[in-house]
Structures are given as structure tokens and as C-alpha cells.
Amino acid sequence: MRSHFCAEISEKDVGKTIKVAGWCNTYRDHGGVVFIDLRDKSGLVQLVCDPSSKAYEKALEVRSEFVLVAKGKARLRGPGLENPKLKTGKIEIVLEELVIENKSATPPIEIGNKNVNEDLRLKYRYLDLRSLNAYEIFKLRSEVALIARNALAQKGFLEIETPILSKTTPEGARDYLVPSRVHEGEFFALPQSPQLFKQLLMVGGMDRYFQIARCFRDEDLRADRQPEFTQIDAEMSFCSENDVMGVVEDLLQEIFKAIGHNISKPFKRMPYKEAMENYGSDKPDLRFELPLIEVGDCFMDSSNAIFSNIAQDPKNKRIKALNVKGADAIFSRSVLKELEEFVCQFGAQGLAYLQIKEDGVKGPLVKFLSEKGLKNILEKTGAKTGDIVFFGAGDKKIVLDYMGRLRLKVAETLDLIDKDALNFLWVVNFPMFEKTENGYHAAHHPFTMPKNIECKDLEEIEAHAYDVVLNGVELGGGSIRIHKEEMQKKVFEKINIHEEEAQKKFGFLLEALKFGAPPHGGFAIGFDRLIMLMTKSSSIRDVIAFPKTQKASCLLTDAPSPINEEQLRELHIRLRK
């Protein structure tokens, strides 16, 4: 049906008869001469037709998004008529034959216009996908999947599918449940990850497994979350943390070659505690400096009781400083007010600061600081004339969170972030347990190997867990797993999953661990998030062919939707009114 893709035609094809197919991108009638920009997956080419052509009458019928097959001779455009924005901007095809394969209603969205309301784009996603940008995204997505498969296969990993219909197990989010027609009153769960099955594959001697896995989580959505998503999932036997990290680094190095980046190995490693204390995040963006500085000791003799009391409780409280170089000449009062309002959204009671001016240090905190305390702050933060030092004080968790967010906000405001940089980081030594209102739960998941399980303070127990971070975004992570039944039971007990409940929920795993499970560990990389970063897309929805909205609905198909009474009866379900 065609001899060339539209954007493949070049000056070497001048004089040749060309046959192309695609959609009418734009249509123009200039004094009786018809110009059509034809679009296919490769790009655009201009078709031209004057009244002397036998294709002229058909060309007059063409409108936007009509499906066309065109035949004609390639020629150079006239002087001054070239379009430097197009790959084919020096060429046009003089129409000899034109077939309208299909007509189109007037499109409700302009193809390729990102400023169109997103709900409308998602409702007509099949039209939105016609844009050249969308094609390039999904071309790269396909290439990266192939690179991942080949890279892991070369390292001896087997691609093995794990079940989609499975058993509900607590992994941090709500499960999507599927009622069983055969087993009345019982439900399957869609997997939040292949976690337990890939561990069982290691027990089964598969040694190295991977899959590009579909996962499902019924959770509140953000810009980088979807209820169904894809991850590059892998597990390996007889391995250390270093072995797993090495595989991930090799894999990411191969993947980023696809977009022309040669990333260096090994990646920097940072303990979780250091990441939180110095950057206020377990996924710090290291493309810029701006570390958080602990200055609690500078407030020990403060005349402000609130600050001095906080300074005397270093286990539970923090006073953090953020020195922003040269900010005094840039941040107006209105900007300082905006920054205060920003941190107050995340639990701050206000935003104290010191302005380092030619005639001394100014700001509301000065009167509460001793001469020694002020001097120590300036030394610790390295503050000089023209700088502003911001302070956060209070509960450790809250302060680290909002000061970490402030760090990012300031970097964005001052344009400190190199958008072309790739800064990879391993965050390691995560806490094994986190305290909640209902006791402790596993910070990663309860199948992670702890480092010091006998420690009486559960919050001090660390896990053999690791996250890989790119530019402040968690790409993925993993852990060394528990491979002995006794240890698994100990961990369950720490999070109040006692024997009866453990057997009910995880009996199959505990049973498997009795039969010589090898030491093993693995990782998962968020595939959608990876492609979002590689393409610099603003939303994860841009890199998924048919994504859900932030309300977990599909505007294209109107899913989820009601089902009829007969289907409900077959599933033994009665809906309450």
C-alpha cells in the first residue's frame, strides 16, 4: 500500500514515484492549489495538487484526519518555500493519485496539542495517541522493554510469568478483589507485586527470574501513580546486596544508552538516616547542594523557651537550617511569605529566617540567640553576606519533611536544578519497622531480612533493603529476603501477626521455607516511572497507552461500570442500596 514512510523521503528521492499513507494533518487551499500535510508514525510530508491533476477533485474532499493513500512524484520545494521545522521540509510530493480510505468526523481535540483539557484527551485517547510525540514515547517504551529482556537474559535470568489471580496479602495498599463464581463468598486478589511467587520460584530452584510484570494497587493516586502499573521485576538466589545492586546498575546503564546517556557505575550510596537528616527525604535529589544543617546545639541557651526545649530533645526533635546563597537580593517579602505558606501546608508553624546583611544579621530570630549561638549558626551553615538562612524546628519527622520540601521549592524557584543531569543514588540501611497508631508495621515489607533483629528498640532495627533514586524520584528498590522459617515468624511477631494469622495469610510461604529455601534477594523498577523520566513527561499518564484518571476511572470506556443482576447472582453478590 506504500513505498515509504512520510518522514523517510529525502532529496535522493527527487524524481521518484512515491506512495505514502497516513492521516491528513492539515489542509490548505491556496488559490486553487491544494496543500495537504500527510502524517504517519514517522512524521509529515507535504502533498501538493493543482487543478491539472486527476487527483484534484478527490483532494478537494479531504478534511482533517481523513485517512489517505497518496501517489506522486517527489520534487524539491520552490526557493523560499522550504520548511526548516520539518525533516522533509525541502521536499513535496506532486499528487497523481489519491484514495480516501476513510473519512473522519471533526476531531474534538487538536492532535498533538498538550494544552487541551486532559480529561478530553483521555476520553479520546485514540486520537491523542496519533501525535508524533506519543508515538516516540511508546517506541522508546518498547525499545526499553526489549533492552531489559535482553540484558537480563544475558545474565542468566529466565522470564517466567506469575499468577494474576492470587490470594490477598497485606503489602501496604488495598487489594483489587475478584469474586469467585465457583467458590461462593471467596475472592481472588490482583497482585500488588509478584513478591511471594518470585520467592517461591527461588525455593523451586529457578535461580534467576524476571518478568515485566503488571501490578495492581487500590490506592489514592498522584501524578506518578496508577491503579495498574508495570514493573521490571527480578529475583536471584545466592546473592548479596552488592550482587543485586550490580545487576540493577548494569541494567540501567544499558537502558539509558537508548537515549544517548553513558551513566557511570557504581552509583553513590547513602544511608537512609543520612538522606533524611541532610536532605529531608529518603529519595534526595542531588543535582544541587542545599543540605539541611543540624543547629540544635546553637539554641541550647536561647531565650526562646520553645527553641531551647526542642534543642534539649535530640532524639525526638530537630532544629534544621537551610542556607540559601545570595537569596537576600532575590527573595522579596512576598516570596518569603509564599515560602512560609508553602511549609505550613506540611505541618510547619511558621518559617523563621536570618538575613545576612552588610550591616549585620537581621531577622526575627536574632533577639532569641546568644552571641555565641549566632556565631555557631553562621559557622555551621557557612552563611555569608547576602545569604538567607531558613529554620525549621519541632517534631523530628515533621521538620525533616517540610524542610526537605522547602529545599526542593527553593531550588526550583532559583532554577538551581540541571534538567539534563542524571544523578543516580542508592539509599540503603532503611529501618525495618515503622511505628503507627496501631503498633509497628514493616517499613518495606515483612519478607525483608533484618540486620539486627535482637535489638530491643524496633525503630533501630535496620533492613537489608535498598532503593535506587534518580533525580529525586524513586525508580525502584528491593531487598534481601528472609529464607528461614524461624526468622520469618520472628518478623511477623514484631508486627503483631501471630501464629494463627500468619498461617492463614502466609502458610504456603512458611511451609515452603521449611524445605531448604536458598538465600535470595531481588528488585523491582517502576517501568512507567522510568519511561516518564526518560521522556521528561510531566505525568505518568503520558507514558501509559490507556491510563486511568486520578479518580481511578477510564474516561474512554467509562470503567468501572455497573454490572447486571444476572452477573451479580452468578457471583453470589447482593448489593446494598
From Swiss-Prot:
InterPro entries recorded: Aa-tRNA-synt_II, aa-tRNA-synth_II, aa-tRNA-synth_II/BPL/LPL, Asp-tRNA-ligase_1, Asp-tRNA-ligase_1_N, Asp/Asn-tRNA-synth_IIb, AspRS_core, GAD-like_sf
Site residues (Important for tRNA non-discrimination), renumbered to this chain: H30, G80
Subcellular location: Cytoplasm
Amino-acid positions noted as binding L-aspartate in the UniProt annotation, renumbered to this chain: E171, R217, H444, R481
Reactions mediated catalytically: tRNA(Asx) + L-aspartate + ATP = L-aspartyl-tRNA(Asx) + AMP + diphosphate
A GO cellular component annotation in the UniProt record: cytoplasm
Main subcellular location of this protein, as a coarse class: cytoplasm
GO molecular function, one term: aspartate-tRNA ligase activity
Cytoplasm in keyword set: yes
Keywords: Aminoacyl-tRNA synthetase, ATP-binding, Cytoplasm, Ligase, Nucleotide-binding, Protein biosynthesis
Aspartate: annotated segments: 195-198
EC number: 6.1.1.23
GO terms, biological process: aspartyl-tRNA aminoacylation
Subunit structure: Homodimer.
Family: Belongs to the class-II aminoacyl-tRNA synthetase family. Type 1 subfamily.
Protein role: Aspartyl-tRNA synthetase with relaxed tRNA specificity since it is able to aspartylate not only its cognate tRNA(Asp) but also tRNA(Asn). Reaction proceeds in two steps: L-aspartate is first activated by ATP to form Asp-AMP and then transferred to the acceptor end of tRNA(Asp/Asn).
HAMAP family: Asp_tRNA_synth_type1
Protein known as: Aspartate--tRNA(Asp/Asn) ligase
Organism: Helicobacter pylori (strain Shi470)
Gene that encodes the chain: aspS
